[in-house]
């Protein structure tokens, strides 16, 4: 492996693979590492991810690696694409093998398991304050990205030069548009809250409530996202962009979203456990709901939709009762978004 590798991707699931394919299509040498050697070996043999993206062949410049140390030393820039509940553990695993000049970017959407901390806080605690960090977030379904369909996304970095470099690496005038955003907190937060609201939109559709109700949930969900962001110091305008409204609309309205499909099953009377089993992949919003609630409680921010979804997922509340609780709330002015 040589020094011309532009990026090492940690995580060979559907999203990690699709981002690696995108970078390789842009003419960059990319290393893709996964924790399961058998899975990575299969990717190398058939030159595609048959499990998640069976119709997309790997470009020649996408290199597979089973040795973590070789993968991490191949490139200065490391893209972490793993579920949020293992994000911290993965950073601990890679830390001893990072190069002195390494920089970390993640496309993981969510918060730290159980604590609800932002992933930037997890990264700083594990990796220290000196290493440059960045986050990639926005409305991206892996299959469409891997197929080269037009997509737009946001990047935020702790160092401007790092953000500029990432924008240049990922940006492709034919299909992939990348917007820089200086709001590091807001870009992270949008990707976590939208998962929760997408479950709610799915529940609503599963109950047969229709397009009016779904749109109301999206709109009021955006208000909850913005309130929490403001309390944490985010720029409110971020939530009208790719990492906020863009990702929220995508995951609330399209059945490629696991969170939405999970919610639809709940709305149809399927149990939480059975719905997770039927999805067959990680439903980020399940854990994100608990984490967002913890974060909102610490920030003293009211998030009624997120609270009712938490009650359904973790307190066995009936979906009809949860819907009635939201519809029966006190009358308010729409502009009263600061507190409620």
From Swiss-Prot:
InterPro entries: 6-PGluconate_DH-like_C_sf (IPR008927), 6PGD_dom2 (IPR013328), G3P_DH_NAD-dep (IPR006168), G3P_DH_NAD-dep_C (IPR006109), G3P_DH_NAD-dep_N (IPR011128), NAD(P)-bd_dom_sf (IPR036291). Pathway: Membrane lipid metabolism; glycerophospholipid metabolism. Its main location: cytoplasm. It is found in: Cytoplasm. The keyword NAD applies. Coiled coil: none annotated. It is an enzyme of class 1 (oxidoreductase). Sn-glycerol 3-phosphate binds at residues 109, 138, 140, 194, 247, 257-259. GO terms for cellular component: cytosol. The active site is at residue 194. It catalyses: sn-glycerol 3-phosphate + NAD(+) = dihydroxyacetone phosphate + NADH + H(+); sn-glycerol 3-phosphate + NADP(+) = dihydroxyacetone phosphate + NADPH + H(+). SUPFAM superfamilies: 6-phosphogluconate dehydrogenase C-terminal domain-like, NAD(P)-binding Rossmann-fold domains. The keyword Translocase does not apply. One of its GO terms (molecular function) is NAD binding. Pfam families: NAD_Gly3P_dh_C, NAD_Gly3P_dh_N. GO terms for biological process: carbohydrate metabolic process; glycerol-3-phosphate biosynthetic process; glycerol-3-phosphate catabolic process; glycerophospholipid biosynthetic process. NADPH binds at residues 14-15, 35, 109, 142, 258, 282, 284. Keywords: Cytoplasm, Lipid biosynthesis, Lipid metabolism, NAD, NADP, Nucleotide-binding, Oxidoreductase, Phospholipid biosynthesis, Phospholipid metabolism. Its EC number is 1.1.1.94. Belongs to the NAD-dependent glycerol-3-phosphate dehydrogenase family. Catalyzes the reduction of the glycolytic intermediate dihydroxyacetone phosphate (DHAP) to sn-glycerol 3-phosphate (G3P), the key precursor for phospholipid synthesis. This is Glycerol-3-phosphate dehydrogenase [NAD(P)+]. It comes from Photorhabdus laumondii subsp. laumondii (strain DSM 15139 / CIP 105565 / TT01) (Photorhabdus luminescens subsp. laumondii).
